[in-house]
Amino acid sequence: MTNIRKTHPLLKIVNNAFIDLPAPSNISSWWNFGSLLGICLILQILTGLFLAMHYTADTTTAFSSVTHICRDVNYGWIIRYMHANGASMFFICLFMHVGRGLYYGSYTYMETWNIGVILLFATMATAFMGYVLPWGQMSFWGATVITNLLSAIPYIGTNLVEWIWGGFSVDKATLTRFFAFHFIFPFIIAALAMVHLLFLHETGSNNPTGISSDADKIPFHPYYTIKDILGALLLILVLMTLVLFSPDLLGDPDNYTPANPLNTPPHIKPEWYFLFAYAILRSIPNKLGGVLALVLSILILVLMPLLHTSKQRSMMFRPISQCLFWILVADLLTLTWIGGQPVEHPYIIIGQLASIMYFLLILVLMPMASTIENNLLKW
């Protein structure tokens, strides 16, 4: 008799996705981040659910309710910090996952890649709205500054911003709708992740060489289930170390001051995982230009399959491209650092140079390097 996991309508789906899935035999630890992102999402939904049980989305009580969670709710402090630092872990995994895709040419799976870019945007939107909820100083002013960027859109900008705010400034209406959206978005992300996986399983996974691995496949279970469990344990170890030893390491001290519309903090900045984009935004003196650069800094990922000029898929055997890739990583780290610095000399010029370098690397230098490498193959 055939095993129930192969015949039952629901178990069959699970079986084909996580048990009998043919996987390349040579995928490295860089392929662990997909499952880690799934774990992060589940963790965020669960901790978020318990936080929502005690949180009140009202300008007068939001800050107090978060304090109440940390002081009075049983293990509320650990739930709150797991949620806040879980977001940081989520973005670390996201950046690693995207970086892996860029390095090994995974973007040639167009549908999977484009759903992934949509997932990245959705996650960034969710994290931004979540940051507003504690209603501290940085929550309020971050929400004001970032939503205000939409006013740069010609003709409809101002109306659009006031429509999002639900009034003439960030207020009660803004907070309640942000809470509603912050609650629903993770479920949309989960649905999109399933579509992401569906498209991936149409083609099968890529591998470090970028060459078809059809001739050498192994079952997902037990090989990669064990490997994913190891990854998950390391993720939880890092997360819990952060939560239990320095929970506020990645946060902003300003967010421990209740929101005050009459007092602007000296340096308004978003969470660390948005700083690279924030630096690109600030490096352009024009408001609309800055907003466009901000959106393009992420949207440029959609162009990756079109910018792929190499005859090889992966960068594994392309030393010049490898060099440029790591320069791009260094550039993004520089932008992240600049995003957290005040707008003054020499940070302004460093930010502008790093922003130019970012677009130059992706749009010009990397495609050029690929073409040079193609010609080197003839020698």
Swiss-Prot record:
Cofactor requirements of the protein: heme b
Transmembrane segments: 33-53, 77-98, 113-133, 178-198, 226-246, 288-308, 320-340, 347-367
Function: Component of the ubiquinol-cytochrome c reductase complex (complex III or cytochrome b-c1 complex) that is part of the mitochondrial respiratory chain. The b-c1 complex mediates electron transfer from ubiquinol to cytochrome c. Contributes to the generation of a proton gradient across the mitochondrial membrane that is then used for ATP synthesis.
Keyword NADP found: no
Record-given protein name: Cytochrome b
Species in which this protein is naturally found: Cephalophorus callipygus
Locations listed in the record: Mitochondrion inner membrane
CDD domains for this protein: cytochrome_b_C, Cytochrome_b_N
Membrane topology field: Multi-pass membrane protein
Keyword match Membrane: yes
